[in-house]
Amino acid sequence: MASKIETLKANLEAALGARAVSLVEAVGELTLVVKASDYLEVAKQLRDDRSLGFEQLIDLCGIDYQTYGDGAYDGPRFAAVLHLLSVANNWRLRVRVFAPDDDLPIVPSVVDIWNSANWYEREAFDLYGIVFEGHPDLRRILTDYGFIGHPFRKDFPVSGYVEMRYDPEEKRVVYQPVTIEPREITPRVIREDRYGGLKH
């Protein structure tokens, strides 16, 4: 008898065919990678196909792969990652779609398929700059209206570009260039023989 994850994998392979760029099992979970051009069609099938039945999107986030792993990442830089749940079949799936353009990352919005994607897509847009084409209200959700850049991108400076403070003379909040001096972080050396006060 096949396990749930084997059954799901077989169902996905049968339903999606060549539209599944990759389908990998790791740590008891399946990750499906699809092209941005197939993303909406695949998402609808994941929801509507009874052999799959992913009626609920439980999470969506952005990822910046600029420096992934041990060095520079070779593939596309930005991806949107969805976590789907099938209550009827009691299984989960991770779906990853890469934006084809690193300079202006655009992927289709899945708000019309799973309305719970609304604020998740806004968050990924705000923090990573991933544009979700077709989103009904794509604007910042966590950062300030005048915020410059996208703070979760790996090339965004840790201290940011501007800082905000209250100016008592102007009696309002003002923006000014960052006054924090850059500092070099020296890694702490851990001596295994004396770590945590323990003697070996």
Curated annotation (Swiss-Prot):
NDH-1 shuttles electrons from NADH, via FMN and iron-sulfur (Fe-S) centers, to quinones in the respiratory chain. The immediate electron acceptor for the enzyme in this species is believed to be ubiquinone. Couples the redox reaction to proton translocation (for every two electrons transferred, four hydrogen ions are translocated across the cytoplasmic membrane), and thus conserves the redox energy in a proton gradient. The gene is nuoC. This is NADH-quinone oxidoreductase subunit C. It is a peripheral membrane protein. It comes from Burkholderia thailandensis (strain ATCC 700388 / DSM 13276 / CCUG 48851 / CIP 106301 / E264). It is an enzyme of class 7 (translocase). InterPro entries: NADH_DH_suC, NADH_quin_OxRdtase_su_C/D-like, NADH_UbQ_OxRdtase_30kDa_su, NADH_UbQ_OxRdtase_CS. GO terms for cellular component: plasma membrane. Belongs to the complex I 30 kDa subunit family.
